[in-house]
Amino acid sequence: MSVVPANIESESLAVGSAEHRRLLGQFFLDTFVDYVPEQMQWPELTDEELARLRGLPFWQEAVSTENVTSNTVAAAAALEADPLVRKAIELQGFEEMRHARLLVALTSHYRIAVESPPRFTPRSLESDFLFAGFGECFDSFFAFGLFALARQSGFFPPALVKVFEPVMQEEARHILFFVNWVKYRRSQLPWWRRPFFRLRCASIILKQVASRVKTARSMGKPQPAGGSGENFTLTAHQDLGAEVTLHRLLELCLRENERRMAEYDSRLKRPRLVPGIARLLYRVIPASV
C-alpha cells in the first residue's frame, strides 16, 4: 500500500487551463492506492493498548464525519461535465466511503461501541462539497500532526500506525485535489458569477474558522460525556495523553503537511490558508504554550 508519487515538475500552469485540468484529474487517478478495509490484517493488541484505543472518545464523531463527507463527495461528482475531473471526484467519494468502512472494520474488530449514523443526503451539491472540502483542509492538517504525535509517543503500536498510513496520505491527496478544484471551478464560471463564488467560499471558510475558534476556547474545560464533539482533530492531542504544547503541535502539523505534500507534482497549487494561519500562530505564541 505504498504511495506512488506523481511526476514532479517545476514549471507552473495557468489555473483553469487544459493542462491544469488534465493534471488535476490524472494525478488523483495515478496515485490511487488499492486496499480493502474488510480484508485488513488488524494487529493483536495488548490489554493496555486495547484499553487506550477503546478509551479514545472521538470514534463516534469520526464515524459520523466520514458518513457526511463520503456521501457529500460522491454526490458532488454530478457537478462536473468534464469526464476526467468527474472520474477523480467519483474516486475521492469511493475513498471517503472506504475510510468509513475502515472505521467500521476497526471498531468492530476491537469491539469499540459506535452507532451507525443515518445516511447523509446533501441538500446543495456545490455548497455542501465546499463546506466538506474546507472542513477537511482544517481537519487533515491537524490530523497529520496528531498522527505523527501518536507515532512518536508510542500511543499507537507500530503495526496499527502502518495500517493507517495510507489513510493519512489519502487525506493529503484529497485536500490537494480540493484546493485545485476550487480554483479550477472558479475559472470555469462566467466572469459575473466568480465574485459570488468567492463570497460563498469566504463565508464557508469563516464558518469553519469560527467553529474551530470556539473549540479552541473550550480546550481544557470539562467536555460532555460520550465524546469529544466536533473538530476532534483540534483537541485529540489531549485524548492521546501526550505532553505537548500547542507550539510543538503546530510545528509537527506544519512539518508533516510539507512532507506529505512534497509527494506530488509541484505544479499543483498547495493549500495555503490553514498552513498560513498555523505558521502565524507558531511565530507569535510562546514555545511554552
Spans of model-derived segments:
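Non-heme di-metal
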Residues: 1-289
